[in-house]
Amino acid sequence: DGRYFTQALTEMEGSGVRLMKMFVDDTPSTTEWLAQKIPEGGKVAFDGRVLSMGEGQEYEEVLGAKNITIEYEVDLIDQIWEDRPSLSKKPCFFLEDKYTGENVASKLKRVREKMAEYGATVHLIASLDDNAWLLNFRGDDIYFFPLVLDYVIVRKDSVDLYIDDSKLNDRIREEMAKNNVNIHPYNDIYDDAK
């Protein structure tokens, strides 16, 4: 919707920030723009946790062709945002079947059936709403959305949940154990998913 572009232009006027209208003719993609701006043999750095694998692969291909070094583990904003609000520490809560319409075991069975159709042995889920639906719990990590920061890896015989352990109450732990869900520290996903 072009109204967002119009509003952005108005609000950014005089800021020194240039609006790049995504998916509009003559506007380069992020990768193309970086390739145009970074010189041969240069370097780009960012927090790789905010990119999809496909974007990362595209960066490697396009920027690598210009011998541009890519640093994926640099979170500059975190380094300079001194009064950054901390993440919510409120515990999440389990939703009973009467509210969700389906128990965790049934949902996992259906996911595994789909995995088998595709010949997949591992399914990584990074979408917070998908994880909340799959495991029937909700939380308070995202303002205005009842979601919890987590990752889920579904395998044939087990599930790995990556979450801040302090968010889990006894009821959720019981339900996760019943469904063979192994609980891991949130940040372990970055090594385990490699």
Whereabouts are the PLM-identified features?
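A composition/biophysics-driven feature that prefers long, compositionally simple stretches
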Residues: 1-194
